[in-house]
């Protein structure tokens, strides 16, 4: 163990060995209300579907700069490796394509290279995050094979609200949040603006010599490129009658990734930046009959458009004035060229009804249409798909005794796809409560995911130390999955321990596979002369299995320690047509061991000064890939502090600061090879928040509760 590791371990021991007060305070984060697993409200401790929650208090203590930062730092099940294509997110070994990301129960939309843009979600406006692993819920679609992340946003009920939060950090990192809300009679409005910017950074100027003609040690390629994005959103709600509410909301988003150019052709010469324009519109309503029964209707439209923004004269794919395709079409500085325009329209009708004999029924209908326009990347320039679904779920409770209670939640979802037909996917979850301290849970669920238009029809070229050709595959088959999980939860005097074992078997898994160039269409090889060709193909079978362990221990009212560990084992096989046999294939980006840990201390120095301090760590073993090397293992530590100053009943000031990557770890693997982490090394940040709120529903900070809290059940 080297000196840095000893120092880190010593800090951890100091944090966890602080003596508890004699009056041990039982953590009541288990009183958190969750909705994601079943679509109905449950206390976390009584949720029949295993749900992990990142609470508002955890978010405040951690001070994350983005959703990616939050998930990576506070739960071991996630892995990220940010690049121009997105966050490269994984959950228990399965990538972004298998993870459903929701904001208040509604899907976010749009991706590049299969990666969602997590910058669409303003971290300052997050109330809490609920995570359900596996295709455990019939409510959100069986294509969520890896799991569901539901980001619950803050709900503002003040008569007048104005807030500003500004964060600055190393490498030109700027995060700006502005919110304005008001209520006039039965009408409420909230307008949100967010701005994010980073100058980017370069961990190394060396290129992988195996991918270049000679050694290059002065490359201009960045580890993370300079980028800027902003978003404006508006939400209106109207409540004409008690229990009846209508809403309308919309947003617009813009992002540009700036790519510096160098002097080595095919390596670091860049002639265009990447630009995105997103828009979304949604409307709907909720009719609450009584405390338990309700009907909701949601209709939404989303657009995600991706462009090249040219910075130099470039010859590329295009159509001449006569409509003929040419790979030598001239583009000039400031020209914009559409690469893909993804549009999605959805309608969702759902009802929740209480039935006799301790049953609660949820049922719904869903319609979805996907449209893709990509003039240079899809044959005929466009493709579309449509899916319909009907689902039903029952929640049943039986008490064998006052302390022994069984909850069973079965569900069925009937899926229909315009190209691949019908598929019925069943699910069942059960929880056995043994007293107030022990919970045993089990889940079995099936998933069904059809190929996307991009996986079927896409064709694109990526220049990265040479030309890489990526191809769709019209012969793809739908993916199916069987997910099994067993978990045990134990609670005792502030200690919460959860152990979960799982197996996720995916048949016909779709992934990018390197194929011989002679298997690609000849016209593409002649036009682009790629050094490697990758195509979407079905694997014969793939398995991810592992164990997740989570521990939280509330030592007293001020001290809390905890951590999580994830063990992952994967197995994937593909049929080799050349040798007519099954061969092992690596699931890209998987790491066998991941962990995270924390120790926090919160203290009220006075009624006008609440302070919090946190020490955090995370680690990962080697991440494995099919090509271009494996990512190195790493261990990163972080310190953060936050201070709230409620100077009056209307005004609140909040100051945050921290150091990330305390021991300055940097992965200097040459460009062209995979990194374990893209961190630039030690960074610092500071955030100032100013909030003015006025109205009869305004909640103020007292000795133990934050003025930022909007969920009355969250006290963690």
Annotate each PLM feature:
Residues 29-59, 88, 99:
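N-terminal periplasmic "start-of-domain" segments of outer-membrane beta-barrel proteins
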Residues 68-106:
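Extracytoplasmic beta-strand/coil segments of soluble accessory domains associated
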Residues 158, 167, 182-274:
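Periplasmic-side early beta-strands and strand-to-turn transitions of outer-membrane beta-barrels
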């Amino acid at each position: 163990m080297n000196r840095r590791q000893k120092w880190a371990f010593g800090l951890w021991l100091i944090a966890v060995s602080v003596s508890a007060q004699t009056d041990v305070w039982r953590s009541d984060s288990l009183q958190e209300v969750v909705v994601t697993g079943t679509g109905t409200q449950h206390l976390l401790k009584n949720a029949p579907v295993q749900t992990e929650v990142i609470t508002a208090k955890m978010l405040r203590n951690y001070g994350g700069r983005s959703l990616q930062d939050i998930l990576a730092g506070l739960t071991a099940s996630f892995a990220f490796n940010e690049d121009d294509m997105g966050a490269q997110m994984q959950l228990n070994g399965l990538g972004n394509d298998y993870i459903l990301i929701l904001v208040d129960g509604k899907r976010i939309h749009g991706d590049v290279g299969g990666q969602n843009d997590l910058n669409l979600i303003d971290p300052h406006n997050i109330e809490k995050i609920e995570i359900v692993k596996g295709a455990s819920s019939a409510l959100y679609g069986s294509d969520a094979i890896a799991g569901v992340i539901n980001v619950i946003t803050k709900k503002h009920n003040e008569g007048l609200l104005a807030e500003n939060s500004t964060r600055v950090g190393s490498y030109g990192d700027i995060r700006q949040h502005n919110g304005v809300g008001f209520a006039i009679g039965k009408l409420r409005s909230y307008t949100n603006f967010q701005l994010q910017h980073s100058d980017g950074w370069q961990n190394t100027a060396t290129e992988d010599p195996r991918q270049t003609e000679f050694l290059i040690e002065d490359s201009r390629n960045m580890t993370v490129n300079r980028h800027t994005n902003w978003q404006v959103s508006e939400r209106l709600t109207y409540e004409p009658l008690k229990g009846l509410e209508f809403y309308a909301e919309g947003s617009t988003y813009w992002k540009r990734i700036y790519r510096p150019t160098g002097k080595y052709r095919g390596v670091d010469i860049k002639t265009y930046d990447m630009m995105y324009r997103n828009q979304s519109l949604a409307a709907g309503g909720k009719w609450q009959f009584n405390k338990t029964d309700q009907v909701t209707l949601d209709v939404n439209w989303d657009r995600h458009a991706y462009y090249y923004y040219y910075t130099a004269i470039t010859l590329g794919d295009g159509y001449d004035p006569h409509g003929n395709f040419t790979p030598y079409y001239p583009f000039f500085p400031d020209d914009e060229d559409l690469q893909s325009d993804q549009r999605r329209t959805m309608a969702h009708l759902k009802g929740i009804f209480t039935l006799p004999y301790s049953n609660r029924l949820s049922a719904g209908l869903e319609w979805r249409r996907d449209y893709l326009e990509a003039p240079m990347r899809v044959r005929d320039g466009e493709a579309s798909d449509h899916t319909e679904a009907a689902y039903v779920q029952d929640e049943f409770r039986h008490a064998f005794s006052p302390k022994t209670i069984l909850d069973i939640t079965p569900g069925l979802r009937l899926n229909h796809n315009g190209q691949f037909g019908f598929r019925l996917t069943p699910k069942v979850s059960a929880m056995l409560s043994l007293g107030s301290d022990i919970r045993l849970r089990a889940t079995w669920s099936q998933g069904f995911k059809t190929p996307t238009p991009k996986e079927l029809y896409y064709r694109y070229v990526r220049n990265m130390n040479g030309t890489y050709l990526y191809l769709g595959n019209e012969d793809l088959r739908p993916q199916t999955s069987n997910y099994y999980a067993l978990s045990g939860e134990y609670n005792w005097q502030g200690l919460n321990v959860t152990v979960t074992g799982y197996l996720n078997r995916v048949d016909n898994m779709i992934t990018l596979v390197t194929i011989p160039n002679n298997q690609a269409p000849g016209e593409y090889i002649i036009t682009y002369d790629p050094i490697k060709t990758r195509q979407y193909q079905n694997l014969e079978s793939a398995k991810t299995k592992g164990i997740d362990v989570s521990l939280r221990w509330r030592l007293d009212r001020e001290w809390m320690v905890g951590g999580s560990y994830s063990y992952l084992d994967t197995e994937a096989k593909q049929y080799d047509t050349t040798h007519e046999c099954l061969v092992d294939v690596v699931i890209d980006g998987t790491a066998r061991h991941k962990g995270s840990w924390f120790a926090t201390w919160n203290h009220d120095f006075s009624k006008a000064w609440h302070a919090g301090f946190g020490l955090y760590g995370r680690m990962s073993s080697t991440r494995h890939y099919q090509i271009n090397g494996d990512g190195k293992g790493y261990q990163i530590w972080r310190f953060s502090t936050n201070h709230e100053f409620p100077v009056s009943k209307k005004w609140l000031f909040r100051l945050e600061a921290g150091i990330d990557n305390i021991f300055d770890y940097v992965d200097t693997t040459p460009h062209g090879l995979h990194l374990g982490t893209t961190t630039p090394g030690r960074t610092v940040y500071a955030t100032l928040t100013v909030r003015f709120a006025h109205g009869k529903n305004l909640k103020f900070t007292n000795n133990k509760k934050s003025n930022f809290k909007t969920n009355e059940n969250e006290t963690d």
